[in-house]
Amino acid sequence: MGKDLVRYYFEIHSGLVTCYYDTNGVSIRHEERTEFEIYPGYHVPEWLKGAVMYQIYVDRFCNGDPSNDVETGEYFYIGDTSVKVDNWEKVPAVMGVREFYGGDLQGVMDKLDYLQELGVDVIYLNPVFVSPSNHKYDCQDYDHIDPHIGRIVEDCDGLLSPGDSDNSHALKYIRRVTDKRNLEASNKLFQELVEEIHRRGMKVILDGVFNHCGSFNKWMDRERIYENQEGYEKGLMFRRTALSFFLLLPGSEPLAL
């Protein structure tokens, strides 16, 4: 197929109606950015062929370190405060993204014998970077593992008062996710976990989610979590209103700090 990137989409005609099929599914308009792509020279790694893969949603897997659990009222997220769930048999809420069961990377480490006994070859980790949700697809800091699933070595009091939705008052959350000691300790734990997985002959796939983030992200800092913390630049929210920078299209202004 040559050395060039191949882009394609399907154009479907039925009478006077024309529609298109691309990465967004079926639509009535064509956009170049949603075309399918084939990368030349791509080959499936040999170790992946026939491998047994085990996907881990970290918060719901195993609580190996209760000291890093998200607390009820630690911060405000999508209309309400965070909730710590003690009963693992509880049915998740409809809006369960702010409910935390306490699973963490230490819990994954503790269960490696179990995973190996199952015959697992590859561990696929759902997102693990700093994020206010339990699924962590709305990344807050791509440089660091979330201390709530990593290690918290520096902590403080400071839960939100009842009725308070201002996360600049969420002192406990701010300390946990901005203190470099917590972030570095969490990165170190992740490194130790990956090294141990590799030592056992298994592989790791990380769901990086590098194509989108959330408004908690330090680049924007809508929640004013980073604005007064040492070592962080002012987020974009500090410099202009939220208009169009959540979706970056060709020709839009760069999201540079």
What are the residue ranges of the model-derived segments?
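The feature marks proteins involved in alpha-glucan
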Residues: 1-55, 63-80, 87
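Substrate-binding/active-site clefts of carbohydrate-active enzymes
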Residues: 58-121, 128-257
